[in-house]
Amino acid sequence: MEQGPQDGEPIEIKIIKEAYKKAFVFVNKGLNTDELGQKEEAKNYYKQGIGHLLRGISISSTDPEYTGPEWESARQMQQKMKETLQNVRTRLEILEKGLATSLRNDLQEVPKLYPEFPPKDMSEKSPEPQSLSSLPQHSEVNGSTSTASAESSSTPTTLSLPCQSHPSEAPPAYTPQAAEGHYTVSYGTESGEFSSVGENFYRNHSQPPPLETLGLDADELILIPNGVQIFFVNPAGEVSAPSYPGYLRIVRFLDNSLDTFLNRPPGFLQVCDWLYPLVPDRSPVLKCTVGAYMFPDTMLQASGCFVGVVLSSELPEDDRELFEDLLRQMSDLRLQTNWDRAEGENEFQIPGISGSASDQLKEASGTDVRQLDPSSKDVRQKGKRGKKTKGTSSEEVNLSHIVPCEPVSEEKAKELPEWSEKVAHNILSGASWVSWGLVKGAEFTGKAIQKGASKLRERIQPEEKPVEVSPAVTKGLYMAKQATGGAAKVSQFLVDGVCTVANCVGKELAPHVKKHGSKLVPESLKKDRNGKSTLDGAMVVAASSVQGFSTVWQGLECAAKCIVNNVSAETVQTVRYKYGHTAGEATHNAVDSAINVGVTAYNIDNIGIKAMVKKTAKQTGHTLLEDYKIIDNSKGENPGGGASANLKGEKDEQKEGPEKNGAKKKDK
């Protein structure tokens, strides 16, 4: 294995690093030219990148003597180069066959105003329009229609009259039957408007472009193939009709180092032909109370334009939750505070024109958001802006109902059975009584120990000459006390760390356990005959049992500490009285060392894997029962000042107990 002349780095690692660097330079150049539509130049860059990738992969790095962090990094580079080589070869094969186009060409390809259909037979041709005099009137109507479909632009487009030498390019006349060269797309009836072309016609125009066209590092986080509509709001408050249901997807770029170089955001949201860049904590998104998501329209240069995204009520709940979770992670998602619908309002009012929603979004849209591409701002398929009709199909998605966003502060009151509340209050009250009794019993026990020790000292005759303890023994006991005290602190620190990790893991697991666990419970256990939740009642009793056990456990802990402190203090004082001050100090160090050893042993027992699993499971259960805790407001019944179901309050009460006991000792 050859070594580098300067820094001692193996020459093989240098070759791998150089090939890695040059390969990705050419691959990135190929991606840029590929996105710009320069296919031939992109293929040349891809081929050069493949050459460097093959060179870097050809170096052997699996020999046993190739060990260390440098070789591990080199192997990771080679693994990444292998994955990139496979993707580049796939893309190059697509380019050479001419089977794919770039994302920009897909989005800039504006469909024709009218769909193309095979010509009819001569026998079925509809009659010619009555006269060309109707064309100016019809063009004026179509002109206003096209202007309404592009309401976000500041300058309305005018529809010029077609040349009479090309009658097939003329817009259809409003005749009872379709004019020559045109086809009836939909027709109205008494029960509504029906489509005459079927669902497949619309679905073929709403398929997402291939993911390969976005680059080698594009990762599709979510794809909703159908059931998503968008509408547009211009600065004047005019709202377009919702588009025909289409697809939605969120794409993230894995290689963040290329974002600045390629002038692209970390990810983007795509709904049919509309794109929105997603930058964490910078891209404003407003979720309205009616369930629609409002975005600033960054594809237009005009300010004050917004886009609303509406999800179908028939979409799976998992897709809806995943979409909102991704928006929280990749944008600045905010919830609308309040929006009241007018009384007697039957039609769905787009929240983009309401004062509160519009103001909130305008305020948030002041953030500078990077665009996907400067030249793609005006790219839009105008044909999808208007609402298209659809036929009665078995796969039809119902978009008439929108899932509203319920306020977070309003919680549904649980209807609990009476027996559950009674049992829960009895458990809490009994636990408080037991805890109070333990603490009081420990206090009386401490007083009895002090009284007995004082009587014992009255009967003991002190030694005339104090017992001399060897300095080596005294120093050894003192060092043992210091060592065991340090071990106790370290073990306690480790236990606290384990508890912290277990608490975090338990809190993260609790929502998933609660969500999937409820599916396993039979419906017969969820509701009783009176419509009250039997399961919630059982959960309330379980939560109260956990709270009661915690209360009793804290009382036991407080009582044990009180008794141990009293026994230790009286033992040291008795030895000091009998054998002198030196022997008393040695006894004090020995007793403290014994206590520290016991505490350390207890802490070590709570650090193992089993203890970690137990604490995680226990914290998961506590978090699950958090919503079912109750508060016992009967202050007169509890001798300790009220049985509170809040564990934090009980901890504070138990902490105050030892402080009061300590104050009594000092007074004595």
From Swiss-Prot:
One of its GO terms (cellular component) is cytoplasm. Residues 190-380 are annotated as: Ubiquitin-binding region (UBR) domain. Residues 431-503 are annotated as: Required for localization to lipid droplets. It is found in: Cytoplasm; Midbody; Lipid droplet. The modification N-acetylmethionine is found at residue 1. The keyword Iron does not apply. Its main location: cytoplasm. This is Spartin. It comes from Bos taurus (Bovine).
